[in-house]
Every structure is written in C-alpha cells, then in structure tokens.
Amino acid sequence: MGNNVVVLGTQWGDEGKGKIVDLLTERAKYVVRYQGGHNAGHTLVINGEKTVLHLIPSGILRENVTSIIGNGVVLSPAALMKEMKELEDRGIPVRERLLLSEACPLILDYHVALDNAREKARGAKAIGTTGRGIGPAYEDKVARRGLRVGDLFDKETFAEKLKEVMEYHNFQLVNYYKAEAVDYQKVLDDTMAVADILTSMVVDVSDLLDQARQRGDFVMFEGAQGTLLDIDHGTYPYVTSSNTTAGGVATGSGLGPRYVDYVLGILKAYSTRVGAGPFPTELFDETGEFLCKQGNEFGATTGRRRRTGWLDTVAVRRAVQLNSLSGFCLTKLDVLDGLKEVKLCVAYRMPDGREVTTTPLAADDWKGVEPIYETMPGWSESTFGVKDRSGLPQAALNYIKRIEELTGVPIDIISTGPDRTETMILRDPFDA
C-alpha cells in the first residue's frame, strides 16, 4: 500500500496532472505542492464546470482534504489572494483547507519586472518564461537575500529587508535594463495588507507530513510543469527554475525521501511544449495542427499555443530513470481518434549518423537530432469518455501496450476526457 503518492509530469508540462490529482484525492487526506509557482496551470473539469488553478493545490475542491503549499514553491501573495477570492466567491472555504510553509519564498513586483526586462533584453534568444517572476524569486532564494512567508511575522524587520533587496534590484532594472524602478512603498503596502492572512495559514509542514505518515494517512504530492523542464535534468537552459522531478518532493516539502511509496508519471499520448527549446518530434504539418485543435493545446496560464508532435519515448525513458516511476497515467488518448496512423519516436539519429536511445545531456547536442519513428495503425472509433479498457479499439490497446514495452513501465490509469469520471483506474496508486 502506498501512503505517499507523487503525481508529476513526464514531458514538458501540460500533461493533465490537475485532473488526475483531483481524481485520486478522493482518498487523500493531504495534497501538497512542492515546487514551481503560479506559472503552473492545472485545469479541472467536474460535472462540466471548469476550474483553473495556478498556485493552490488541486485538492482544494475536496471537502475533508487539506491542501499544502510547501517550501519549494515560490509564492506570489497577489496571485494567491486572487485565486483564493475566485474560489471563495464560489463558496469554497479556502482558508479552512489551505496551509503554507513559512519557508516559501515570496514573489513580489520587482521579480516580475526583472523577469520581463530580461526576456525583452534576450530578444530572439528569449527562453519563453511566463513572465511571472518565478526565476528571479528562485535566484533570490539561492542568493540568500529572498524574503519568505515567515518574514511576515515581524513586519518592521520585513520592511527593512524589503528596502535593502529592492535597492539592489532597482539598481539593475534602471542601470542595466533601462527599465523603470519598482515603487518600494507600494510593494510594502500591498504585502502588509495581506500579511496576516498569509501568516494565519502557516504550519510546520515537515512535522505535519511526518505525523501523517505515522498515522498512515494518504498524502498526494502534486508536481507542476514536467520532468524535461527540470532545472538540473531538463533541456537546459530552456527549463523552469525548480526541480520538477521526484527528487523535488523531499526538498520541496520536508518529507523524508525514503517515505515516497509510489511515483505516478502523467504521460500525454502525444507530445507538446510551450516556449523555446529542443523538441525532436515537433510537427509542422496538418497532423500537428490536428493535434493542437483536437487537444485544445493552448496554455492554461499564458494562453500561448503549444507546439505539438508525436510521443517521444526516448525522452520519456529519461523521465522513467530520473523519477523511478512506478506507473503511468496516459492522458488525452482520445485526441488521437481518427488518425490513420500514429507514430512513436523510438530512437534519435544524431548529426554524425549514430543512432541513440537516450536523450542528449547538453542543449547544443540536441541540434540536428532527427527522430526515428515506429509507425502503427490508428483507429477511427471514438475513445472519448470510454470508462472500461474492453471498450477501447484494438489499435488503441496496441498503442498502449507498445508504450509499456518501450518504457518498461505499466500504464495504471487511462484518461479519455477532461472530466474526472472519464478515467479508467487499472491500478490505484494508493493500493499499489
């Protein structure tokens, strides 16, 4: 039995994690975010009603579930307040269900200004960040100058620390980026206005999780973005600023690494990517357009069109290695309905002619990589909303089986639509 279950993306994000976390939290006592910030976009559809969460864990819609934002998350007070209000306006008692780590770094206005100034300065070499201040906030954390949720308990000291760090960042903005300075008093006033709300939700997350473990409570750890965007193991520098892999669970929540019982990798039936960076299986033809249209591939956070392509099992195998995956949840299988043939990338051909079955390590080594495909028959029957494996077309079952063979990981859950009911649970992670 797995009490501590991790749900994370195995590709470049946008795999459909939010729905699966929401579904599995029916049995969970706690849901924990452990990295990222409000650059995530987790879409839930329940009885036809759509909810998009960026910062608050997907368990917030469940009664009797406590949602926790762990220390690995960079927290924007403005974004949190906005999201809380939207949920509270719908009658969801967020403050009764949400807890925060005092060690969460704060994202403030100057982080956003820096993020946008840097992307503008990069020009054609822009990384394609969400422009929400995530990277600069993590930089401040590592440089040990960042302000944290716990700093809000002492408002006088907070004001002094804020003044010092803003002098540093405003100097950069004005003198290097030729941008406008951020107003200190406004940042201070805005933050102080919500300080008591934030501090009222603070708990010792590591201790809480250890007590939950000792009681045998079910805990779900909700990843954001995807494995291939990991700051250390992703397609650097076209990555996010946090550890999106399973290792981030321990460091970003305070749970001891030995206590992770099951790691569920969310795997989209094809590949997508937002922003710049390597993408060997990207399609620029009518099939790519088909996947974008059928899959509604537009970012929940930015609204940007996602790049689309065939499923890359070479990249996915890297995710298997990095996360020690226990099983997959295959999502958006229904998007492939109607295609005469489907392709799986099984290897890469390097510029020198070599065939490799592992991903390059350095970003420059991805240049000129060509995908080697295995082509399989498609299916004309609809898989949308199918809730039993026996109801899937044989060609779809063959596709699923081949993914399992190529990755060495079983597909334990199959999603055939956006609603939480449109799902087949072949093996429940909490029972594995």
Curated annotation (Swiss-Prot):
PROSITE patterns: ADENYLOSUCCIN_SYN_1, ADENYLOSUCCIN_SYN_2. Its cofactor is Mg(2+). It is found in: Cytoplasm. It comes from the Bacteria. CDD domains: AdSS. Changing G16V: Significant reduction in activity. The keyword Ribonucleoprotein does not apply. GTP binds at residues 13-19, 41-43, 306, 332-334, 415-417. Belongs to the adenylosuccinate synthetase family. Homodimer. This is Adenylosuccinate synthetase. It comes from Escherichia coli (strain K12).
